[in-house]
Each structure stands twice: as C-alpha cells, then as structure tokens.
Regions:
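Hydrophobic alpha-helical transmembrane segments and their immediately adjacent juxtamembrane loops
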Residues: 2-16, 279-374
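Long amphipathic alpha-helical coiled-coil segments
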Residues: 259-271, 295-306
C-alpha cells in the first residue's frame, strides 16, 4: 500500500507539469487567435515587426499586439507592411493605429498624386512607384513603364507601408535595414520612410536608364533606311514618358518639405539622407525632361525625312513627265495633216525622226539623273 502511494505521489508532479504545458500551449494559441480576430480573412499583411533600439524583436506579431509591445518601450516602433489591403482590413488597422479616414480612403483606392499630408500626429506620404517592362520591340500597344502606388503612414511609434502594384517590393529594403543598416533604424519610423522613398527613387533612375536605351534604338531606326516607320513607336514612347513624368515630377514638393530645415518633420540625421534622395529625384526629373525634348527632335527629324521623301517622289514624277512630253509632242506633230512634209519624201526621214527622239530622251534622262531627280 505504501509503495502504491509513493508511486502515485511521484506521478502527480509529472501530471501537473504536463497539464501546465498544455495550458500554456492552448493559451498561446487562443491569444494568437484573439489578437488576429480584428482582421478579416485573407489578410494583406506582408510583414509586421517590432524594433527596439534599431533591432528587430524575434517572433511573429499581429498589428495590435505589435503596437502594444512598442508602446511599452521608449525606443521602439512597429513596421507594418501591407499589400493591396481591402477597405474592411484597412479600417480595422486604422482603428488600432488611429489613422484618419481620409488617409485610409486614399490608401485603399490608390489613385493619388504624390503628396505629403499631416493628420494630427500621423504623417501620410504618397509615392508613385515605377517599373520598366521589358519588350522585344516598341509598338503602339507596348507597355514600357508600369506604375503603382506606395503609401507610408508615419507615427510616433509606428510606420505603415501600403503597396499597390508589383513595383517596388519592400522585402529587400527591410532586409537591408535589418542586416546592414541597423544603426539607421535607431532613428525611428522616419528611417523606414527614408528607406522606402530611396528605393522608389532608385527604381526611377533604373527606369530612366532603360528608357534612354529605347530612345537610342528609336533614334537609330529613324536614320536607318532599312527600318520601317518609327512614328508609332515615337508616339507610344511619348505616352509612356508622360505616365512616368506623372510619377516623378509631383514628388519634388513632398521631398522638398521633408528635407527642409524649417519643417522640422524629421530628425536631423535622417534629413541628410532625404536630401540625398532629393538630389537623385532632381536628376531623374532632368533626365525625363531631356528625353521629352529628344523625342520631339526625333519626331521633327522623321517628319522632315517624310517631307524630303515626298519631294523626291514629286521630282521623279516631274522628270518622267518631262521625258514623256517629248514623245507626246512628237506624236502630235507627226499626226497633223500638213500638205507638204519634206521629211516624208526623204529616205532617212523616218529613222532620223526616231534617232532624234531617242537622242533627246537620253539627254534629258542624263540631265535629270545628274541633278538627282532620277
């Protein structure tokens, strides 16, 4: 009996330990389910990380759990990445993070010009992304530049990036900040806003370089007699350039506001980085303007070629008409009913007449050929 009691007493701690472990597992699962209960199915959350002192904390977090954790420490913030969220999901996140309804509407519709707005303690930055679409040849249906949108909400303890379209994936940006530029993350949410903006503008430069290569091909085709008419390609490139300009040019004002010392929006250390991005954007804007001027010059050159070709055709018509006039005049003269035509009585009259016509024809042909009319 004593042995059975001792065995029972030894097994009771094991049972309590097993039960405690199961309760912790079930409790953690229930906590995860409850934390994500405020988000609809098919979540657009790409990544949600908590950063303390510039270092990402291990573990997976829901948006509301991440914000609660970030509010516990002074040097921490949340980076929440979204891809094409729906209205219901964006509204749930807005309630958690205190986002303004107008900014939420813009983030869902994704049809905004680049801008910077402030809603209380939250700044709302809109960027237009761009990506070069490879193609074999440029036609009137070719897509050269694919654009999308990037929205960035910058708060005191969070930064939310909302991406629409396939351009400017932020995975490499996040990895670069976490592994190679962790010191920059110590500056807080504006460091992420800088990294995202820098990524978008760097892609602008890549697109501009690819467009320049296309322009070289178009220019070569204009002055190559073997190619077809490049006018359709020129107009298509102008349309694509207009689309690219809509993404690039309006971003100048928001970046100028962020980089300005008077604004006081960002820390001084981050402002220096934004000024570098502003310089890159200025370079891109200058490239786009020069490309537009180059396209206009190429178009004018092509139209001048068409005019010259038409004039050459008209000169050819005029030259052959002049040669034909000689034969027409001779036929008219010989067809008249004169009573006395001395050449008819001459034995060499008929062959002499043909020899004279051929001589005049050859002389006219050589004259037109020498002057470039034929």
């Amino acid at each position: 009996m004593a042995e059975r009691e001792n065995g029972w007493n030894r097994s009771r701690p094991l049972s309590r330990a097993f039960a405690g472990a199961m309760n912790r597992i079930l409790g953690a699962a229930e906590a995860r389910d409850n934390a994500g209960a405020n988000l609809p199915d098919g979540s657009a959350v790409v990544d949600c990380g908590v950063y303390v002192g510039g270092k990402r904390q291990p573990g997976n977090y829901t948006p509301d759990a991440a914000l609660r954790l970030a509010q516990e420490r002074e040097d921490s913030f949340v980076w929440l990445g979204l891809h094409e969220p729906g209205e219901a999901e964006m509204s749930a996140i807005a309630r958690t993070y205190g986002l303004h309804e107008l900014a939420v509407e813009d983030a869902v519709k994704a049809e905004q010009r680049p801008k910077l707005e402030q809603f209380g303690p939250v700044h709302f930055l809109v960027l237009r992304t761009a990506r070069y679409v490879p193609h074999r040849e440029l036609t009137e249906t070719s897509q050269v530049v694919e654009t999308g949108q990037m929205m960035v909400f910058i708060g005191e303890r969070f930064v939310i990036t909302v991406r629409h379209g396939d351009a400017s994936e932020l995975g490499p940006v996040r990895q670069n900040l976490e592994t190679e530029r962790g010191v920059l993350l110590e500056q807080g949410p504006w460091a992420v806003a800088y990294a995202v903006t820098d990524r978008v503008v760097d892609l602008y430069l890549e697109v501009a370089d690819q467009i320049e290569a296309d322009l070289d091909i178009i220019e070569e085709g204009v002055f190559s007699r073997d190619s077809g008419s490049p006018i359709q390609a020129i107009y298509q490139m102008k349309r694509e350039l207009v689309e690219f300009r809509r993404a690039v040019v309006p971003l100048q004002r928001p970046l100028a506001a962020i980089a300005s010392k008077q604004s006081g929006l960002v820390p001084n250390e981050i402002r220096r980085y934004f000024r570098d991005v502003q310089d890159h954007l200025t370079r891109t804007v200058e490239q786009v303007s020069s490309y537009d001027d180059l396209l206009n010059s190429i178009l004018q050159a092509r139209l001048a070629q068409v005019t010259v070709d038409q004039n050459n055709d008209m000169r050819k018509f005029a030259a052959w008409a002049g040669i034909a006039t000689v034969w027409t005049a001779a036929a008219g003269i010989e067809g008249m009913n004169f009573r006395h035509m001395p050449e008819l009585e001459w034995i060499y009259g008929y062959p002499g007449f043909w020899a004279l016509l051929l001589l005049i024809t050859v002389l006219l042909y050589r004259a037109f050929r020498r002057n470039g009319w034929l």
